[in-house]
């Protein structure tokens, strides 16, 4: 799946946050829903303007961002007490 066909970010919509093309549904909102335990089907029912492919594109976008970033938000992540 090529996320670049479905994920856009423009400064005049949602303060430039990445979102599903032709919607105001942000990648952040989708990640929050998934983290809260919503299924893809739950999301599609709640937000009928998006598809499962849109959600997959959002996941692919986030995965690529994390692969390319050279840092981790250590302050937000838990601490591994077993690390030597």
Residue spans of the language-model regions?
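Basic, low-complexity segments
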Residues: 1-15
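Structural/interface elements that position substrates and couple domains in central-metabolism enzymes
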Residues: 41, 45-46, 75, 80-84
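C-terminal structural segments of small proteins and small subunits
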Residues: 52-76, 83
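Amphipathic, hydrophobic secondary-structure cores in small proteins
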Residues: 21-61
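Residue-identity detector for threonine
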Residues: 10-13, 23, 51, 82
